[in-house]
A protein has these predicted regions:
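A generic structural signal for short
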Residues: 5-6, 89-90, 114
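Conserved residues at the C-terminal ends of beta-strands
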Residues: 5, 75, 142
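Metal-dependent catalytic neighborhoods of phosphoester/phosphodiester hydrolases
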Residues: 12-19
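Gly/Ser/Thr-rich loops at beta-strand to alpha-helix junctions
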Residues: 6-11, 117-121
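Active-site gating/metal-coordination segments in enzymes
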Residues: 19-23, 27-111, 146-150, 165-168, ...
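Short, surface-exposed alpha-helical segments at coil->helix boundaries
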Residues: 14, 95, 122-123
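Catalytic domains of carbohydrate-active enzymes, especially glycoside hydrolases
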Residues: 1-3
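Active-site core of metal-dependent hydrolases
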Residues: 107-181
């Protein structure tokens, strides 16, 4: 199976995924989420957390174009390179979407996949999801390899606390030569 988490606003296309899956025989799990704030649908800023959660739940339970989402993701918080990951904070609108993702996860049982590159935002994302009641054993922190260092201890100091909290680290930047030549 392939988990495909292109969010709304930057090319999510459930109908095309279905066509590819049927043509190839490969099971594709589609995600539902929003990317960065510049690509959020206009209604998100004024919507309640519950309304956003309902939107995610509807995509999981009913689907779009005959395809139900099997994961909430890729849920993103802004890319900000910070020297100390503990200094990273989600912006208020991002926090609202993360809380909605946690609520939708509790209602549906599906996993959450995040976008946490550059700023090493995984800890702040997990903090928000945990406060909102998410099951961290069903959370994947994406792009953990986006800031690979020669100093493995520095990297482990980021990865191990994520794993100790029960979440998963996703290493998915393989082949992106601009990042890791």
């Amino acid at each position: 199976a392939i988990v495909e988490v292109t969010p709304e606003g930057i090319g999510r296309n459930p109908g095309k995924l279905r066509e590819i899956a049927e043509g190839s025989g490969v099971h594709i799990v589609s995600g539902i989420a929003f990317y960065d704030q510049s690509t959020y649908p206009d209604w998100v800023a004024s919507a309640s957390i519950g309304t956003i959660a309902d939107y995610f739940v509807k995509h999981v339970e009913e689907g779009q174009e005959g395809v139900r989402a099997g994961v909430i993701g890729e849920v993103m918080s802004h890319n900000e390179a910070v020297a100390n990951p503990s200094g990273y904070r989600l912006e208020p609108l991002e926090e609202k979407v993360f809380i909605a993702a946690a609520q939708a996860q509790r209602r549906t049982g599906v996993a959450i996949s995040t976008h946490a590159s550059l700023g090493r935002a995984g800890h702040a994302q997990l903090d928000t999801l945990e406060r909102a009641g998410a099951d961290l054993s069903r959370v994947v922190i994406g792009h953990c390899d986006a800031h690979w260092h020669e100093d493995i201890e520095r990297d482990l100091s980021y990865y191990l606390p994520i794993l100790e909290r029960g979440a998963f680290c996703q290493f998915d930047m393989i082949g992106w030569e601009q990042l890791m030549p």
